[in-house]
From Swiss-Prot:
Keywords: Cell membrane, Cell projection, Cytoplasm, Membrane, Microtubule, Neurogenesis, Nucleus, Phosphoprotein. Detected in brain, eye and heart. In brain, the different isoforms display different patterns of expression. Expressed in brain and heart (at protein level). Isoform 3 is highly expressed in cardiac myocytes while isoform 1 is the most abundant in brain. Residues 157-164 are annotated as: Tubulin-binding domain necessary and sufficient for tubulin-binding. Microtubule-binding protein which directly binds tubulin and is involved in both polymerization and stabilization of microtubules. Through its action on microtubules, may participate to the refinement of axons by negatively regulating axonal and leading processes branching. Plays a crucial role in neuron polarization and migration in the cerebral cortex and the hippocampus. Regulates voltage-gated sodium channel transport and function. May also play a role in MAPK signaling. This is Fibroblast growth factor 13. SMART domains: FGF. The gene is Fgf13. One of its GO terms (molecular function) is protein kinase activator activity. It comes from Mus musculus.
């Protein structure tokens, strides 16, 4: 009997000690991990909040990225196409001019936007074939890119062409390095031929397409007070009487 009572007391003491240990573990730091169970609970809550927040961030769709190039456009006439700070479009023989750098941004199948790196202005062609520059990306800023012989490339308006023959209107420079009206440029002549000289590949955000009716000609970069309408629409220079190739 005494042995049984002793055994019972021993069991009770052991159980009491185990209960005390378990209670102590809830608020006493563990020597091996150095964190209390209370701290662990807090960490679990914080980690869940953080995980929830990270899941939210993952749901955000990244900006659409378009792979284009920074390039120079060398005309078969012996000039580099350039877009100057005042919006003038012409040709130059100065290979080091920073205004000869263009962003060629793909905006469709074999369709590009041509944007000056320095000015951030887009090249555009209006319904009369005049070249001008625009702060906003509109349908007139879209050019079809076609590979010609000997790796030369032509750029024609996506929305304007000869009504009867269907012949395209092309970006072109004459022998003096002056910009030409698109409907005066023939695709098989040197005036229309450009040789891209890519410098690097770049990623671009898709340009926001603006409707032409949103802007007046003055809002699209044409004309300015100091110039005539025809002058600015012809690349910012007075039109040449002889626009031959």
């Amino acid at each position: 009997m005494a042995a049984a009572i002793a055994s019972s007391l021993i069991r009770q003491k052991r159980q009491a000690r185990e209960r005390e240990k378990s209670n102590a573990c809830k608020c006493v730091s563990s020597p091996s991990k150095g964190k209390t169970s209370c701290d662990k609970n807090k960490l679990n809550v914080f980690s869940r909040v953080k995980l929830f927040g990270s899941k939210k961030r993952r749901r955000r769709r990244p900006e659409p990225q378009l792979k284009g190039i920074v390039t120079k456009l060398y005309s078969r006439q012996g000039y580099h196409l350039q877009l100057q700070a005042d919006g003038t479009i012409d040709g130059t023989k100065d290979e080091d001019s920073t205004y000869t750098l263009f962003n060629l941004i793909p905006v469709g199948l074999r369709v590009v936007a041509i944007q000056g790196v320095q000015t951030k202005l887009y090249l555009a062609m209006n319904s009369e074939g005049y070249l001008y520059t625009s702060e906003h990306f509109t349908p007139e800023c879209k050019f079809k890119e076609s590979v010609f012989e000997n790796y030369y490339v032509t750029y024609s308006s996506m929305i304007y062409r000869q009504q009867q023959s269907g012949r395209g209107w092309y970006l072109g420079l004459n022998k003096e390095g002056e910009i030409m009206k698109g409907n005066h440029v023939k695709k098989n002549k040197p005036a229309a031929h450009f040789l891209p000289k890519p410098l690097k590949v770049a990623m671009y955000k898709e340009p926001s397409l603006h409707d032409l009716t949103e802007f007046s000609r003055s809002g699209s970069g044409t004309p300015t007070k100091s110039r005539s309408v025809s002058g600015v629409l012809n690349g910012g220079k007075s039109m040449s009487h002889n626009e031959s190739t």
